[in-house]
Amino acid sequence: RIMTKSEKLFERAVKRIPGGVNSPVRAYGAIGEAPRFIERAEGCYIYDVDGNRYIDYIDSWGPMILGHNFPAIRESVLKACEKGLSFGCATEIEVEMAEFICDRIPHVDMIRMVNSGTEAVMSAIRVARGYTGKNKIIKFAGCYHGHSDAMLVSAGSGVMTSGVPDSAGVPKGCTEDTMLAAYNDLGSVETLFQQADGQVAAVIVEAVGANMGVVPPREGFLQGLRALCDQYHALLIFDEVITGFRLAFGGAAQYFGVTPDLVTYGKIIGAGMPVGAYGGRRDVMELVAPAGKVYQAGTLSGNPVAMAAGLTQLKYLYDHQEIYTELEKKGELLYGGMGKIVKEKGLNYQMNYVGSLGSLFFTGQPVVDYVSAKSSDTVAFAEYFKKMLNMGIHMAPSQFEAMFLSAAHTDEIIMETLDAVKLVL
């Protein structure tokens, strides 16, 4: 068999890049074959270096909510580039971005731009500790909050996929103040609060679990977290790197009607450029340097080209909020349709979804947390993924990642996808 261009590129890549990729899940490690190398993208399609076209349900892991290569975003980036790529100084567009978000999201009084979701989480946790004078953080098994040392505890995402529970190189001291609760289990959270004896600075949670596959919060779970944080004088941090500006313009906080003290953003806020952000209550955010004593900095934070991309996307989403209603309908058509196919075929699998995020779990038990997600048959998933890929449908190469819908996925494309699912399952 003649090697494909993707296979040849991967062969070259592994000699110079650890594992051949710059982020583990891209390696198709759970699938057992070389990853596809992508050359270009348009709308809901991506094209690999071998000339194959795929319907894409990764959306660059979430940022491309309007579809790939959206004209207005592309033009804003090109226009910004004409003025220079980076100045190392304050710019007007940073102010515009901050004002645009804070004026429209009630729980964000102030916001600070960074370069990734990981940076946003690291910073939010530092601020929470600085504000409360406490050290302990409660997180949930299966929730992924980036690759900072303190958060690599039962972290979901690529950590789950590779079968590595934590990470080498993380000293015990970095995680000894991280307390682990069970997602969707308020009792486990209250127990940790009681054990911590008033030393919990914050609870951090993916408002919708999206890195152990999609796991929706049970009714009352997020509200219960808010109440517990109030009771024990801790901050509530919503990690909205995935859900921010996706479930609603105001993210999961708006979608579920629960107000966090701090929130982290990524993905959509940068429209495909490396952008993260953290924000929230004014009295908390005023502790960030140079206004306060909690230090955080970044050479490229608030990069003008990245801000141009992100602000253009956010303005479009705010001005066209019918997109969120349409994405809900698309989610029902695709994920609801997949669930019906599973039922019609008598398969004992679970279809979880919230809005435009969805996961088909190859397990017979309802998936409500990390433990039930891990019961999935990853071998069966790998076979499903390969068959779908061969039919021109590109999904996350892991049982424990989400599918993403965009505004560019038409009903016709969704029906084409469902036809493939019928043949493959």
Residue ranges and their predicted role:
Residues I2-L425:
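Conserved N-terminal phosphate-binding loop of PLP-dependent enzymes in the Aspartate aminotransferase
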